[in-house]
Amino acid sequence: RQFQNDFERLGFDAKDGESDEDEMVRQTALSYLIQADYQPAVLAAASVFQAHKENIESIPASVRGLVLINQMKQEDSLTLVEDYVNAYVTTNDSNFRRQLTQAVSYLKNQEGLDYVLGQLKDKHVVKPQDLYLWYMNFLSKSFAQETVWNWAKDNWDWIKAALGGDMSFDSFVNIPAGIFKTQERLDQYIAFFEPQTSDKALERNILMGIKTIAARV
């Protein structure tokens, strides 16, 4: 109820004379309410999206990430997924790219997920050093987890070739360790990674990953 009160008091848009604390409270309240599909916040976010539909980068940066997430949660269409990916490719704003990566991961349609996975190996869409952010966001979502985990295993040789000299390569060992929490996923993690402990560059992270998941199961 407190978040609803904060939203009713502060609204969606920043106002003249507001304090930094007001903005922080707004962000926290909106994040919770949009995740909870609280209709007044959902409708307000949708209204902001519609007002900027022709140029979603122009959505006020302070609420843009939440507006993009809300639209994906509510619309969940292949067209919107394509729009977000196209915006990702054309923008020069790294913060906007991060917001788009997070927002598109809220999709719950297989067609959209297949489309995204089809783009990940195209360096003109996703730079190899940014791939881990897409992996982390999608792997953490229950709808996408199985498909994305299998994609990573199936494309491991390509990931290793593309990122073997980049520090973000370690993320593909560490990210699932930070997310997985079932015995089934632990067994899969061990089956895939344990044979790779002969690679000294990966051994420590793999063994730590196994311990991390096991402690959570």
Predicted regions and their residues:
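Long, ordered, helix-rich scaffold segments
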Residues: 1-217
